[in-house]
């Protein structure tokens, strides 16, 4: 929007452009910045920042006649992020919610005084990447962004990790006295653990190895079910559809999608987190739970479902919310069946394929490097993959748990480098120039990967 730089929660295009929301959840402002940051990291195409673009008019929801450069749009966007931290902190205000639509706040006080731990972690990840990729183009923007993400890091650990467990939310009371929500100490919601902040804190490298280990144990004990990793350890309280804290989570009569807690978008992000920290025993097996093909071989308490469609959720077979409230643990013991939820919904299939290729098989390319960083279980030793990278057809063979990390392209050893994330070495990297010199556009190129234990 032209007045403050915020984005609508949802919007339509072209002749329907006047149809859009006039507010948004607290995380929405972050995603456009993440898109630009990811693009610059991949391409270093800084010319895009000089492209002139209109805004959306707050008055009539149409495009403005006035245009500004993308960098000016980003300037406005970052100002909005700064202006909407909880007072005296670098914690993003919850606003009208976050990714989980069912947890929209039920009253104005919660909207203004809550922060989502997941949104805070996403903001840290995005602003940090933007600071890094913008450095050689605009050092002032880089320094400004650095101050923000360092502040986010400090306040996340000061307020949200004041206890050993990351809360789902933080409510900032008078005198900046934090109250942890969806946390073992939370007596109001009756919910102890929330998945999204834990996995995003790993993906963003916001927490250290000791904290990662602690939260993996929590996920294993409280959030991992036979069919999927769940958003919370139990559903929000249901009392006839009356909202006390959250809207749809406490209103919905149907225990499906996010209300039923096994929302597959979040399960995929769990796979991404396990790849980031190097848990090969978790990556492949949890991807298998998503595919409906032969689902009963992987999830034995699954009911029959269509085999050629992506399902956005795995819903417990409860007839009422009260039944689910009393017997939710039967999903863990497999006494209760699970069924496929909404089909072919939103970006799920794309996120699924991206995690398979980019983070589990580990094939990633940026402006000058090809990285192969598999996080695969040892039973897939010898796996071969036919893959096309630009105009090069490749047969990639994965030799796992080797004593030496090396790569051969068409039988010849390649000089490699290795990058360390906060938790582990990330496979092997090859200069793209070398890759193109050693491969051909005709026929199949053999790429043999020899990789040590993750």
Feature names for model-found ranges:
Residues 1-6, 30-31, 37-115, 140, ...:
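Active-site acid/base region of carbohydrate-active enzymes
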Residues 1-89, 116-120, 124, 257-283, ...:
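Aromatic-rich carbohydrate-recognition surfaces in CAZymes
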Residues 14-19, 95-117, 179-189, 201, ...:
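Active-site-adjacent structural elements in folded domains
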Residues 26-29, 43-44, 113, 188, ...:
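Short, well-ordered loop/turn elements at secondary-structure boundaries
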Residues 178-180, 194-198, 246-250, 265-266, ...:
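Short acidic (Asp/Glu) and glycine-rich catalytic loops that position anionic groups and cofactors
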């Amino acid at each position: 929007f032209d007045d403050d730089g915020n984005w609508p929660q949802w919007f339509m295009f072209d002749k329907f452009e006047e149809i859009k929301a006039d507010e948004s959840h607290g995380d929405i402002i972050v995603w456009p910045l993440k898109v630009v940051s990811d693009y610059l990291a991949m391409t270093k195409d800084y010319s895009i920042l000089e492209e002139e673009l209109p805004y959306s008019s707050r008055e009539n929801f149409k495009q403005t006649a006035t245009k500004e450069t993308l960098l000016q749009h980003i300037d406005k966007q970052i100002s909005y992020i700064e202006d909407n931290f909880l007072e005296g902190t670098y914690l993003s205000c919850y606003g009208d919610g976050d990714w989980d639509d069912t947890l929209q706040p039920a009253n104005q006080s919660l909207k203004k005084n809550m922060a989502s731990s997941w949104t805070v972690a996403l903001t840290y990840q995005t602003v940090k990447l933007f600071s890094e990729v913008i450095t050689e183009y605009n050092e002032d923007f880089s320094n400004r962004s650095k101050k923000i993400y360092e502040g986010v890091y400090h306040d996340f650990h000061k307020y949200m990790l004041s206890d050993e467990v990351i809360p789902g939310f933080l409510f900032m009371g008078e005198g900046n006295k934090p109250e942890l929500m969806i946390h073992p100490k939370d007596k109001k919601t009756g919910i102890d653990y929330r998945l999204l902040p834990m996995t995003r804190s790993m993906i963003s490298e916001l927490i250290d190895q000791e904290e990662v280990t602690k939260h993996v144990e929590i996920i294993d004990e409280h959030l991992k079910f036979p069919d999927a990793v769940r958003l919370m350890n139990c559903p929000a309280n249901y009392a006839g559809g009356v909202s006390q804290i959250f809207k749809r989570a406490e209103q919905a009569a149907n225990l499906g999608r996010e209300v039923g807690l096994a929302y597959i978008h979040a399960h995929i992000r769990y796979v991404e987190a396990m790849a980031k920290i190097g848990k090969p025993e978790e990556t492949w097996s949890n991807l298998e739970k998503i595919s409906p093909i032969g689902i009963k071989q992987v999830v034995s308490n699954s009911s029959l479902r269509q085999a050629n469609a992506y399902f956005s959720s795995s819903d417990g077979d409860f007839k009422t919310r009260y039944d689910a409230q009393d017997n939710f643990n039967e999903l863990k013991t497999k006494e209760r069946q699970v069924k496929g939820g909404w089909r072919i919904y939103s970006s799920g299939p794309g996120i699924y394929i991206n995690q398979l290729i980019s983070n589990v098989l580990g094939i990633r390319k940026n402006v000058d490097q090809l990285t192969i960083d598999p996080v695969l279980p040892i039973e897939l030793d010898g796996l071969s993959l036919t893959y096309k990278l630009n105009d090069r057809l490749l047969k990639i063979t994965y030799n796992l748990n080797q004593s030496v990390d090396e790569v051969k392209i068409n039988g010849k050893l390649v000089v490699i480098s290795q990058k360390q994330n906060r938790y582990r070495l990330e496979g092997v990297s090859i200069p793209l120039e070398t890759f193109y010199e050693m491969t051909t556009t005709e026929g199949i190129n053999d790429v043999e990967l020899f990789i040590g234990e993750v």
